[in-house]
Amino acid sequence: MNSSGGSCSSLMDVVAYDHHLHHGHDEELHVLAVDDNLIDRKLVERLLKISCCKVTTAENALRALEYLGLGDQNQHIDALTCNVMKVSLIITDYCMPGMTGFELLKKVKESSNLREVPVVIMSSENIPTRINKCLASGAQMFMQKPLKLADVEKLKCHLMNCRS
């Protein structure tokens, strides 16, 4: 797990708005980026830093669930509350060993604490049935890998359109 911050001049407006409504103050936005491929994970982290103030990375869905407080049932409730309150967006690869991004999406949407957090699924494969399954299960968006800066802008515009 890795967290890093940076300065932002243009934040994802809708995520910032939702974050402000839920938390009542202007703290850094927090994106959880999940990908088993180190290069893809670093690329996503770099692109998100351009639009977001803070990015936490996880190398697989199980580590992401642990971070979110959904992994180990014995995890202390304070850690769960702390991390849930800070995550504004989850972006995850679809194909990962152990647990897929789709399974992570389902776990997040089943959680009463996390179901409102937007989840974006990424994949290098453009399979319409997979895309439709993810969107029908609550994914905010499905994006083709490798991500580019234009994709981050597309995500921003999509989230803004969903708000209105």
UniProtKB/Swiss-Prot annotation:
GO cellular component, one term: nucleus
UniProt main location, coarse: nucleus
Record PTM 4-aspartylphosphate, positions in chain: 93
Subcellular location: Nucleus
Keyword Transport set for record: no
Pfam families attached to this UniProt entry: Response_reg (PF00072)
A Gene Ontology BP annotation from the UniProt entry: phosphorelay signal transduction system
Response regulatory domain span: 30-160
UniProt key word Phosphoprotein: yes
Entry comment on modification after translation: Two-component system major event consists of a His-to-Asp phosphorelay between a sensor histidine kinase (HK) and a response regulator (RR). In plants, the His-to-Asp phosphorelay involves an additional intermediate named Histidine-containing phosphotransfer protein (HPt). This multistep phosphorelay consists of a His-Asp-His-Asp sequential transfer of a phosphate group between first a His and an Asp of the HK protein, followed by the transfer to a conserved His of the HPt protein and finally the transfer to an Asp in the receiver domain of the RR protein.
SMART domains, per the entry: REC
Induction remark: By cytokinin (BA) in roots.
InterPro entries, per the entry: ARR-like, CheY-like_superfamily, Sig_transdc_resp-reg_receiver
Annotated disulfide bonds: none
Keywords from the named record: Cytokinin signaling pathway, Nucleus, Phosphoprotein, Transcription, Transcription regulation, Two-component regulatory system
Role description: Functions as a response regulator involved in His-to-Asp phosphorelay signal transduction system. Phosphorylation of the Asp residue in the receiver domain activates the ability of the protein to promote the transcription of target genes. Type-A response regulators seem to act as negative regulators of the cytokinin signaling.
The family this protein is said to belong to: Belongs to the ARR family. Type-A subfamily.
Protein's name in the database: Two-component response regulator ARR16
Annotated organism of origin: Arabidopsis thaliana (Mouse-ear cress)
UniProt lineage: Eukaryota, Viridiplantae, Streptophyta, Embryophyta, Tracheophyta
